[in-house]
Amino acid sequence: MESGSEEPDEQLLLLSEPALHAGPPAGRAAPGGAVRLRGEPGLEEEEEGEEDSGPEGDGEEEPLLRASGRGRRAGAARDKEPRVGAGHTGHAIDMNTFLDDPEFAEIITRAEQVIECGVLPERISQGSSGSYFVKDCKGKTIGVFKPKSEEPYGHLNPKWTKYFHKICCPCCFGRGCLVPNQGYLSEAGAYLVDDKLGLGVVPKTKVVWLVSETFNYSAIDRAKSRGKKYALEKVPKVAKKFNRIGLPPKVGSFQLFVEGYKEADYWLRKFETDPLPENTRKEFQSQFERLVILDYVIRNTDRGNDNWLVRYEKQDDGLNLSDKDIQWTVTEESTIKIAAIDNGLAFPFKHPDEWRAYPFHWAWLSQAQVPFSQETRDLVLPRISDMNFVQDLCEDLHELFKTDKGFDKATFENQMSVMRGQILNLTQALKDGKSPIQLVQMPRVIVERSSTGSQGRIVHLSNAFTQTFHSRKPFFSSW
Protein backbone atom coordinates (compact mmCIF):
# COMPACT_ATOMS: atom_id res chain seq x y z
CA MET A 1 0.00 0.00 0.00
CA GLU A 2 1.31 3.36 -0.96
CA SER A 3 1.04 6.30 1.33
CA GLY A 4 2.03 9.90 0.85
CA SER A 5 3.76 11.30 3.93
CA GLU A 6 5.33 14.48 2.61
CA GLU A 7 4.49 17.72 4.36
CA PRO A 8 2.37 19.85 2.02
CA ASP A 9 3.66 23.18 0.83
CA GLU A 10 0.39 25.08 1.06
CA GLN A 11 -0.47 28.24 -0.81
CA LEU A 12 -3.72 30.16 -0.78
CA LEU A 13 -5.17 32.20 -3.60
CA LEU A 14 -7.71 34.94 -2.93
CA LEU A 15 -10.35 34.92 -5.61
CA SER A 16 -11.52 38.09 -7.30
CA GLU A 17 -14.77 39.76 -6.22
CA PRO A 18 -17.56 38.83 -8.68
CA ALA A 19 -20.53 40.96 -9.61
CA LEU A 20 -23.68 40.56 -7.56
CA HIS A 21 -27.09 39.91 -9.02
CA ALA A 22 -30.68 39.43 -8.03
CA GLY A 23 -31.87 36.45 -6.01
CA PRO A 24 -34.39 33.80 -7.04
CA PRO A 25 -38.16 34.10 -7.03
CA ALA A 26 -39.80 33.81 -3.66
CA GLY A 27 -40.99 30.41 -2.56
CA ARG A 28 -38.37 28.37 -4.35
CA ALA A 29 -38.18 24.89 -2.92
CA ALA A 30 -34.97 23.37 -1.66
CA PRO A 31 -33.33 21.52 -4.56
CA GLY A 32 -33.86 17.80 -4.62
CA GLY A 33 -36.33 17.75 -1.74
CA ALA A 34 -39.78 18.73 -0.60
CA VAL A 35 -40.64 21.91 1.27
CA ARG A 36 -41.26 20.80 4.82
CA LEU A 37 -44.48 22.12 6.31
CA ARG A 38 -44.57 22.15 10.08
CA GLY A 39 -47.79 20.94 11.62
CA GLU A 40 -48.79 19.94 15.15
CA PRO A 41 -46.04 18.27 17.17
CA GLY A 42 -46.05 14.57 16.53
CA LEU A 43 -44.06 11.46 16.10
CA GLU A 44 -41.34 11.27 13.47
CA GLU A 45 -39.89 8.28 11.76
CA GLU A 46 -37.27 6.67 13.95
CA GLU A 47 -33.96 6.43 12.21
CA GLU A 48 -30.74 4.76 13.13
CA GLY A 49 -28.01 7.12 14.27
CA GLU A 50 -25.26 7.73 11.77
CA GLU A 51 -21.57 7.92 12.30
CA ASP A 52 -19.67 10.93 11.05
CA SER A 53 -16.19 10.40 9.80
CA GLY A 54 -13.45 12.80 8.95
CA PRO A 55 -11.43 13.01 5.78
CA GLU A 56 -8.02 11.66 5.07
CA GLY A 57 -5.64 13.07 2.54
CA ASP A 58 -2.03 13.88 2.12
CA GLY A 59 0.34 15.14 -0.49
CA GLU A 60 1.45 18.37 -2.07
CA GLU A 61 -0.78 21.43 -2.23
CA GLU A 62 -1.08 24.08 -4.90
CA PRO A 63 -3.22 27.19 -5.32
CA LEU A 64 -6.51 26.76 -7.15
CA LEU A 65 -7.17 28.22 -10.59
CA ARG A 66 -8.78 31.66 -10.74
CA ALA A 67 -12.55 32.15 -10.73
CA SER A 68 -14.62 33.96 -13.30
CA GLY A 69 -16.50 37.09 -12.38
CA ARG A 70 -20.00 35.89 -13.10
CA GLY A 71 -22.41 35.58 -10.20
CA ARG A 72 -25.27 33.24 -9.60
CA ARG A 73 -28.53 33.38 -7.79
CA ALA A 74 -28.45 33.73 -4.03
CA GLY A 75 -30.48 32.05 -1.35
CA ALA A 76 -33.06 29.27 -1.37
CA ALA A 77 -36.03 28.31 0.74
CA ARG A 78 -34.99 26.67 4.00
CA ASP A 79 -36.90 23.60 4.99
CA LYS A 80 -37.49 21.75 8.20
CA GLU A 81 -38.16 18.13 9.02
CA PRO A 82 -41.89 17.49 8.94
CA ARG A 83 -44.14 16.49 11.74
CA VAL A 84 -47.47 14.81 11.29
CA GLY A 85 -50.47 16.71 12.57
CA ALA A 86 -52.73 15.44 15.34
CA GLY A 87 -55.16 12.81 14.18
CA HIS A 88 -53.18 12.17 11.02
CA THR A 89 -53.92 8.74 9.58
CA GLY A 90 -50.37 8.12 8.46
CA HIS A 91 -50.29 9.35 4.86
CA ALA A 92 -47.66 11.95 3.90
CA ILE A 93 -49.67 14.40 1.79
CA ASP A 94 -48.83 17.35 4.04
CA MET A 95 -45.11 16.57 3.82
CA ASN A 96 -44.64 16.56 0.06
CA THR A 97 -44.95 20.03 -1.43
CA PHE A 98 -42.83 20.93 -4.47
CA LEU A 99 -43.36 24.59 -5.25
CA ASP A 100 -40.90 24.61 -8.15
CA ASP A 101 -42.14 21.42 -9.84
CA PRO A 102 -45.96 21.08 -10.00
CA GLU A 103 -45.71 18.17 -12.44
CA PHE A 104 -43.63 16.10 -10.01
CA ALA A 105 -45.91 17.18 -7.15
CA GLU A 106 -48.90 15.83 -9.07
CA ILE A 107 -47.16 12.48 -9.58
CA ILE A 108 -46.44 12.16 -5.86
CA THR A 109 -50.00 13.17 -4.97
CA ARG A 110 -51.38 10.48 -7.28
CA ALA A 111 -48.97 7.94 -5.78
CA GLU A 112 -50.18 8.77 -2.27
CA GLN A 113 -53.81 8.51 -3.33
CA VAL A 114 -53.46 5.12 -5.01
CA ILE A 115 -51.58 3.77 -1.97
CA GLU A 116 -54.50 4.83 0.22
CA CYS A 117 -56.84 3.11 -2.24
CA GLY A 118 -54.96 -0.17 -1.79
CA VAL A 119 -52.55 -0.22 -4.75
CA LEU A 120 -49.47 -0.75 -2.61
CA PRO A 121 -45.80 -0.39 -3.64
CA GLU A 122 -44.12 -3.66 -4.59
CA ARG A 123 -40.73 -4.55 -3.12
CA ILE A 124 -38.01 -5.05 -5.75
CA SER A 125 -36.40 -8.47 -5.39
CA GLN A 126 -33.04 -7.43 -6.82
CA GLY A 127 -30.47 -5.48 -4.86
CA SER A 128 -29.31 -5.49 -1.26
CA SER A 129 -31.78 -2.98 0.18
CA GLY A 130 -35.48 -2.31 0.48
CA SER A 131 -36.61 -0.48 -2.66
CA TYR A 132 -40.10 -0.40 -4.12
CA PHE A 133 -41.95 -0.01 -7.40
CA VAL A 134 -44.66 2.61 -6.90
CA LYS A 135 -47.67 2.15 -9.17
CA ASP A 136 -50.62 4.16 -10.45
CA CYS A 137 -54.29 3.20 -10.25
CA LYS A 138 -53.91 0.91 -13.29
CA GLY A 139 -50.98 -0.96 -11.77
CA LYS A 140 -48.43 0.70 -14.05
CA THR A 141 -45.07 1.49 -12.43
CA ILE A 142 -44.48 5.24 -12.13
CA GLY A 143 -41.46 5.43 -9.83
CA VAL A 144 -38.92 3.74 -7.58
CA PHE A 145 -38.95 4.63 -3.87
CA LYS A 146 -35.90 3.89 -1.71
CA PRO A 147 -36.54 4.56 2.01
CA LYS A 148 -33.63 5.75 4.10
CA SER A 149 -34.31 3.24 6.87
CA GLU A 150 -34.15 0.33 4.41
CA GLU A 151 -30.86 1.21 2.73
CA PRO A 152 -28.12 -1.47 2.64
CA TYR A 153 -26.91 -0.48 6.11
CA GLY A 154 -30.20 0.85 7.45
CA HIS A 155 -31.63 -0.71 10.61
CA LEU A 156 -34.82 -1.78 8.79
CA ASN A 157 -33.21 -3.29 5.69
CA PRO A 158 -35.50 -6.23 4.87
CA LYS A 159 -32.77 -8.19 3.08
CA TRP A 160 -30.26 -10.23 5.06
CA THR A 161 -27.28 -9.92 2.73
CA LYS A 162 -25.72 -6.93 4.46
CA TYR A 163 -26.58 -8.30 7.93
CA PHE A 164 -24.49 -11.42 7.27
CA HIS A 165 -21.83 -9.22 5.71
CA LYS A 166 -21.66 -7.20 8.92
CA ILE A 167 -21.56 -10.28 11.17
CA CYS A 168 -19.21 -12.48 9.13
CA CYS A 169 -16.84 -9.88 7.68
CA PRO A 170 -16.97 -6.72 9.81
CA CYS A 171 -13.54 -5.53 8.64
CA CYS A 172 -14.90 -5.08 5.10
CA PHE A 173 -18.33 -3.85 6.15
CA GLY A 174 -19.50 -0.68 4.43
CA ARG A 175 -17.50 1.82 2.38
CA GLY A 176 -15.12 3.81 4.51
CA CYS A 177 -15.23 6.82 2.19
CA LEU A 178 -19.02 7.31 2.33
CA VAL A 179 -21.32 8.78 4.95
CA PRO A 180 -23.38 5.83 6.24
CA ASN A 181 -27.09 5.63 5.44
CA GLN A 182 -27.16 8.67 3.17
CA GLY A 183 -28.02 6.92 -0.08
CA TYR A 184 -31.36 8.65 -0.56
CA LEU A 185 -29.62 12.04 -0.50
CA SER A 186 -26.99 10.75 -2.92
CA GLU A 187 -29.75 9.68 -5.33
CA ALA A 188 -31.41 13.11 -5.19
CA GLY A 189 -28.03 14.88 -5.28
CA ALA A 190 -27.03 13.03 -8.46
CA TYR A 191 -30.15 14.32 -10.20
CA LEU A 192 -29.43 17.83 -8.93
CA VAL A 193 -25.90 17.73 -10.40
CA ASP A 194 -27.21 16.24 -13.64
CA ASP A 195 -29.81 18.99 -13.94
CA LYS A 196 -27.36 21.81 -13.15
CA LEU A 197 -24.87 20.57 -15.75
CA GLY A 198 -27.58 20.01 -18.37
CA LEU A 199 -26.62 16.36 -18.87
CA GLY A 200 -30.11 14.85 -18.90
CA VAL A 201 -29.11 11.27 -18.09
CA VAL A 202 -30.55 10.90 -14.56
CA PRO A 203 -34.32 10.36 -14.28
CA LYS A 204 -35.94 13.00 -12.09
CA THR A 205 -35.25 12.11 -8.45
CA LYS A 206 -36.30 13.96 -5.30
CA VAL A 207 -36.71 13.37 -1.59
CA VAL A 208 -40.26 12.45 -0.56
CA TRP A 209 -42.16 10.95 2.37
CA LEU A 210 -44.39 7.91 1.78
CA VAL A 211 -46.19 5.37 3.97
CA SER A 212 -47.34 1.89 2.99
CA GLU A 213 -48.13 -1.42 4.66
CA THR A 214 -45.65 -3.10 2.32
CA PHE A 215 -42.70 -1.09 3.65
CA ASN A 216 -40.57 -2.79 6.31
CA TYR A 217 -41.56 -1.47 9.74
CA SER A 218 -40.53 -2.64 13.18
CA ALA A 219 -42.90 -4.82 15.19
CA ILE A 220 -43.34 -1.95 17.65
CA ASP A 221 -44.46 0.47 14.93
CA ARG A 222 -46.96 -2.03 13.58
CA ALA A 223 -48.28 -2.80 17.06
CA LYS A 224 -48.72 0.92 17.80
CA SER A 225 -50.55 1.39 14.52
CA ARG A 226 -52.95 -1.48 15.22
CA GLY A 227 -53.55 -0.24 18.77
CA LYS A 228 -54.35 3.31 17.68
CA LYS A 229 -56.70 2.14 14.94
CA TYR A 230 -58.49 -0.06 17.46
CA ALA A 231 -58.76 2.85 19.89
CA LEU A 232 -60.12 5.06 17.11
CA GLU A 233 -62.91 2.57 16.50
CA LYS A 234 -63.72 1.88 20.15
CA VAL A 235 -62.90 5.15 21.95
CA PRO A 236 -62.86 7.99 19.37
CA LYS A 237 -62.50 10.73 21.99
CA VAL A 238 -59.26 9.23 23.30
CA ALA A 239 -57.94 8.50 19.81
CA LYS A 240 -58.32 12.14 18.80
CA LYS A 241 -55.46 12.96 21.18
CA PHE A 242 -53.02 10.78 19.24
CA ASN A 243 -50.40 12.60 17.20
CA ARG A 244 -50.75 10.10 14.36
CA ILE A 245 -53.00 7.21 13.45
CA GLY A 246 -51.34 4.55 11.33
CA LEU A 247 -47.78 3.75 10.38
CA PRO A 248 -45.14 6.53 10.32
CA PRO A 249 -44.16 7.94 6.90
CA LYS A 250 -40.71 7.06 5.62
CA VAL A 251 -38.31 9.51 4.03
CA GLY A 252 -36.46 8.37 0.94
CA SER A 253 -35.64 9.06 -2.69
CA PHE A 254 -38.32 8.82 -5.38
CA GLN A 255 -37.06 8.36 -8.93
CA LEU A 256 -39.41 8.48 -11.91
CA PHE A 257 -39.59 5.16 -13.71
CA VAL A 258 -38.17 5.06 -17.25
CA GLU A 259 -39.78 2.74 -19.80
CA GLY A 260 -38.23 0.87 -22.69
CA TYR A 261 -34.73 0.69 -21.18
CA LYS A 262 -32.54 -2.37 -20.67
CA GLU A 263 -29.27 -2.87 -18.81
CA ALA A 264 -26.23 -1.54 -20.65
CA ASP A 265 -24.61 -5.00 -20.60
CA TYR A 266 -27.40 -6.33 -22.82
CA TRP A 267 -27.02 -3.66 -25.49
CA LEU A 268 -23.22 -3.58 -25.38
CA ARG A 269 -23.18 -7.28 -26.30
CA LYS A 270 -25.73 -6.63 -29.06
CA PHE A 271 -23.67 -3.80 -30.49
CA GLU A 272 -20.63 -6.09 -30.78
CA THR A 273 -22.46 -8.32 -33.27
CA ASP A 274 -24.72 -5.67 -34.79
CA PRO A 275 -22.79 -2.36 -34.91
CA LEU A 276 -24.71 0.88 -34.68
CA PRO A 277 -25.19 3.16 -37.69
CA GLU A 278 -22.69 6.03 -37.69
CA ASN A 279 -25.17 8.73 -36.66
CA THR A 280 -26.54 6.56 -33.85
CA ARG A 281 -23.00 5.64 -32.76
CA LYS A 282 -22.14 9.34 -32.39
CA GLU A 283 -25.33 9.91 -30.42
CA PHE A 284 -24.48 6.99 -28.12
CA GLN A 285 -20.94 8.33 -27.65
CA SER A 286 -22.36 11.73 -26.66
CA GLN A 287 -24.72 10.12 -24.14
CA PHE A 288 -21.88 7.98 -22.80
CA GLU A 289 -19.70 11.05 -22.23
CA ARG A 290 -22.49 12.62 -20.17
CA LEU A 291 -22.65 9.50 -18.02
CA VAL A 292 -18.88 9.71 -17.53
CA ILE A 293 -19.07 13.36 -16.47
CA LEU A 294 -21.86 12.68 -13.98
CA ASP A 295 -20.11 9.71 -12.37
CA TYR A 296 -16.78 11.51 -12.20
CA VAL A 297 -18.16 14.71 -10.64
CA ILE A 298 -20.14 12.91 -7.92
CA ARG A 299 -17.42 10.22 -7.62
CA ASN A 300 -19.84 7.33 -7.95
CA THR A 301 -18.35 4.31 -6.14
CA ASP A 302 -20.85 1.83 -7.57
CA ARG A 303 -21.01 2.14 -11.35
CA GLY A 304 -21.03 -1.19 -13.13
CA ASN A 305 -22.42 -1.92 -16.57
CA ASP A 306 -25.54 -3.39 -14.98
CA ASN A 307 -26.78 -0.21 -13.29
CA TRP A 308 -26.95 2.18 -16.20
CA LEU A 309 -29.60 1.68 -18.82
CA VAL A 310 -29.88 2.09 -22.58
CA ARG A 311 -32.97 2.60 -24.72
CA TYR A 312 -32.44 1.90 -28.41
CA GLU A 313 -35.20 2.69 -30.89
CA LYS A 314 -34.08 1.04 -34.09
CA GLN A 315 -34.89 2.43 -37.53
CA ASP A 316 -37.34 0.37 -39.60
CA ASP A 317 -35.10 -1.10 -42.30
CA GLY A 318 -37.30 -4.01 -43.34
CA LEU A 319 -35.61 -6.60 -41.11
CA ASN A 320 -37.58 -9.59 -39.83
CA LEU A 321 -38.33 -8.71 -36.21
CA SER A 322 -39.87 -12.07 -35.27
CA ASP A 323 -36.90 -12.85 -33.04
CA LYS A 324 -38.30 -12.19 -29.56
CA ASP A 325 -34.81 -11.75 -28.16
CA ILE A 326 -34.42 -8.50 -30.12
CA GLN A 327 -36.56 -6.22 -27.99
CA TRP A 328 -36.02 -2.86 -29.60
CA THR A 329 -38.59 -0.32 -30.71
CA VAL A 330 -38.96 0.30 -34.44
CA THR A 331 -39.06 3.96 -35.53
CA GLU A 332 -38.50 5.98 -38.69
CA GLU A 333 -35.13 7.17 -37.36
CA SER A 334 -32.82 5.38 -34.94
CA THR A 335 -32.46 7.00 -31.51
CA ILE A 336 -30.52 5.97 -28.43
CA LYS A 337 -30.66 7.24 -24.86
CA ILE A 338 -28.84 6.46 -21.61
CA ALA A 339 -30.36 6.55 -18.13
CA ALA A 340 -28.03 6.67 -15.10
CA ILE A 341 -29.80 4.97 -12.20
CA ASP A 342 -28.57 3.63 -8.83
CA ASN A 343 -26.62 6.70 -7.73
CA GLY A 344 -26.93 6.03 -3.99
CA LEU A 345 -23.24 5.35 -3.33
CA ALA A 346 -21.71 8.65 -4.38
CA PHE A 347 -20.46 11.91 -2.80
CA PRO A 348 -17.62 10.45 -0.68
CA PHE A 349 -16.00 12.63 1.98
CA LYS A 350 -12.56 11.37 0.90
CA HIS A 351 -11.11 9.57 -2.06
CA PRO A 352 -11.17 5.77 -1.68
CA ASP A 353 -7.83 4.91 -0.09
CA GLU A 354 -8.36 1.80 2.04
CA TRP A 355 -9.11 -1.64 0.57
CA ARG A 356 -10.91 -1.08 -2.71
CA ALA A 357 -10.68 1.62 -5.38
CA TYR A 358 -14.34 1.35 -6.52
CA PRO A 359 -13.46 1.94 -10.19
CA PHE A 360 -15.81 3.09 -12.92
CA HIS A 361 -16.51 -0.03 -14.95
CA TRP A 362 -17.25 1.98 -18.08
CA ALA A 363 -13.54 2.87 -18.15
CA TRP A 364 -12.79 -0.48 -19.83
CA LEU A 365 -15.22 0.09 -22.70
CA SER A 366 -13.99 1.14 -26.13
CA GLN A 367 -16.08 4.33 -25.87
CA ALA A 368 -13.87 5.46 -22.97
CA GLN A 369 -10.84 5.66 -25.27
CA VAL A 370 -12.42 8.30 -27.51
CA PRO A 371 -11.60 11.94 -26.60
CA PHE A 372 -14.49 14.05 -25.33
CA SER A 373 -16.43 15.53 -28.24
CA GLN A 374 -16.66 19.23 -28.96
CA GLU A 375 -20.38 19.04 -28.22
CA THR A 376 -19.71 17.80 -24.70
CA ARG A 377 -16.98 20.34 -24.13
CA ASP A 378 -19.22 23.20 -25.26
CA LEU A 379 -22.00 21.99 -22.97
CA VAL A 380 -20.05 21.48 -19.76
CA LEU A 381 -16.84 23.52 -19.86
CA PRO A 382 -18.37 27.04 -19.67
CA ARG A 383 -20.22 26.01 -16.51
CA ILE A 384 -17.60 24.15 -14.51
CA SER A 385 -14.80 26.61 -15.34
CA ASP A 386 -16.77 29.29 -13.45
CA MET A 387 -16.06 29.04 -9.72
CA ASN A 388 -19.30 30.89 -8.97
CA PHE A 389 -21.23 28.12 -10.74
CA VAL A 390 -19.36 25.50 -8.74
CA GLN A 391 -20.04 27.34 -5.49
CA ASP A 392 -23.72 27.66 -6.41
CA LEU A 393 -23.84 23.91 -7.02
CA CYS A 394 -22.30 23.28 -3.60
CA GLU A 395 -24.91 25.53 -1.98
CA ASP A 396 -27.73 23.67 -3.73
CA LEU A 397 -26.35 20.39 -2.41
CA HIS A 398 -26.06 21.95 1.05
CA GLU A 399 -29.76 22.85 0.95
CA LEU A 400 -30.54 19.23 0.10
CA PHE A 401 -28.15 17.41 2.44
CA LYS A 402 -28.91 19.51 5.51
CA THR A 403 -32.49 18.18 5.57
CA ASP A 404 -31.11 14.92 7.01
CA LYS A 405 -31.22 14.93 10.80
CA GLY A 406 -27.73 13.40 10.93
CA PHE A 407 -26.25 16.21 8.82
CA ASP A 408 -22.74 17.28 9.84
CA LYS A 409 -21.40 20.47 8.28
CA ALA A 410 -17.72 19.47 8.54
CA THR A 411 -18.35 16.15 6.80
CA PHE A 412 -20.36 17.90 4.10
CA GLU A 413 -17.48 20.32 3.50
CA ASN A 414 -15.21 17.32 3.01
CA GLN A 415 -17.66 15.89 0.47
CA MET A 416 -17.64 19.18 -1.42
CA SER A 417 -13.82 19.32 -1.30
CA VAL A 418 -13.70 16.00 -3.13
CA MET A 419 -16.33 17.14 -5.65
CA ARG A 420 -14.52 20.43 -6.34
CA GLY A 421 -11.34 18.44 -6.97
CA GLN A 422 -13.16 16.19 -9.42
CA ILE A 423 -14.54 19.25 -11.20
CA LEU A 424 -11.06 20.79 -11.38
CA ASN A 425 -9.67 17.63 -13.01
CA LEU A 426 -12.61 17.45 -15.40
CA THR A 427 -12.11 21.08 -16.42
CA GLN A 428 -8.47 20.44 -17.27
CA ALA A 429 -9.28 17.20 -19.12
CA LEU A 430 -11.89 18.91 -21.31
CA LYS A 431 -9.51 21.78 -22.08
CA ASP A 432 -6.76 19.33 -23.04
CA GLY A 433 -9.02 17.15 -25.19
CA LYS A 434 -8.48 14.04 -23.06
CA SER A 435 -10.56 10.86 -23.17
CA PRO A 436 -12.60 9.37 -20.28
CA ILE A 437 -9.90 6.77 -19.56
CA GLN A 438 -7.28 9.52 -19.39
CA LEU A 439 -9.57 11.48 -17.08
CA VAL A 440 -9.83 8.70 -14.50
CA GLN A 441 -6.04 8.26 -14.59
CA MET A 442 -5.40 11.87 -13.56
CA PRO A 443 -4.00 12.46 -10.04
CA ARG A 444 -6.73 12.62 -7.43
CA VAL A 445 -7.31 16.11 -6.08
CA ILE A 446 -9.26 17.76 -3.29
CA VAL A 447 -10.05 21.47 -3.22
CA GLU A 448 -10.67 22.74 0.30
CA ARG A 449 -12.19 26.05 1.29
CA SER A 450 -10.34 27.96 3.99
CA SER A 451 -11.94 28.12 7.43
CA THR A 452 -12.13 31.92 7.14
CA GLY A 453 -14.10 31.76 3.88
CA SER A 454 -17.72 32.88 4.00
CA GLN A 455 -20.72 30.65 3.25
CA GLY A 456 -22.73 31.66 0.21
CA ARG A 457 -23.44 31.18 -3.48
CA ILE A 458 -20.97 33.80 -4.71
CA VAL A 459 -17.20 33.55 -4.32
CA HIS A 460 -16.08 36.61 -2.37
CA LEU A 461 -12.68 38.16 -1.86
CA SER A 462 -12.49 36.51 1.56
CA ASN A 463 -12.77 33.02 0.04
CA ALA A 464 -9.55 31.09 -0.45
CA PHE A 465 -9.27 27.55 -1.80
CA THR A 466 -6.40 25.10 -1.55
CA GLN A 467 -5.68 22.37 -4.08
CA THR A 468 -4.21 19.17 -2.61
CA PHE A 469 -3.04 16.05 -4.44
CA HIS A 470 -4.27 12.92 -2.66
CA SER A 471 -1.48 10.38 -3.18
CA ARG A 472 -2.57 7.54 -0.90
CA LYS A 473 -3.95 4.64 -2.94
CA PRO A 474 -6.22 1.72 -2.00
CA PHE A 475 -4.68 -1.70 -1.38
CA PHE A 476 -6.46 -3.08 -4.47
CA SER A 477 -6.12 -0.40 -7.12
CA SER A 478 -6.98 -0.59 -10.82
CA TRP A 479 -5.03 2.54 -11.81
Curated annotation (Swiss-Prot):
Compartment(s) of residence: Cytoplasm, Cytosol; Golgi apparatus membrane; Endoplasmic reticulum membrane; Cell membrane
> What residue spans carry the Acidic residues bias annotation?
1-10, 42-62
Major subcellular location class:
cytoplasm
Region spans: Disordered: 1-91
Enzyme Commission number(s) of this protein: 2.7.1.67
**Bias (Low complexity) ranges:** 18-34
Residue ranges of the region described as Catalytic loop = 299-307
- What GO molecular function annotations does the UniProt record carry, in alphabetical order? 1-phosphatidylinositol 4-kinase activity; ATP binding
Q: Which UniProt keywords apply?
A: ATP-binding, Cell membrane, Cytoplasm, Endoplasmic reticulum, Endosome, Golgi apparatus, Kinase, Lipid metabolism, Membrane, Nucleotide-binding, Transferase
One record GO biological process? Golgi organization
Tell me the ranges covered by the PI3K/PI4K catalytic domain, including all copies.
Answer: 118-449
Residues binding ATP are S131, K146, Q255, L256, F257, V258, R269, K270, D342
The task this protein performs is described as: Contributes to the overall PI4-kinase activity of the cell. This contribution may be especially significant in plasma membrane, endosomal and Golgi compartments. The phosphorylation of phosphatidylinositol (PI) to PI4P is the first committed step in the generation of phosphatidylinositol 4,5-bisphosphate (PIP2), a precursor of the second messenger inositol 1,4,5-trisphosphate (InsP3).
Membership in a protein family: Belongs to the PI3/PI4-kinase family. Type II PI4K subfamily.
UniProt-recorded name of the protein: Phosphatidylinositol 4-kinase type 2-beta
Supply the source organism for this entry. Gallus gallus
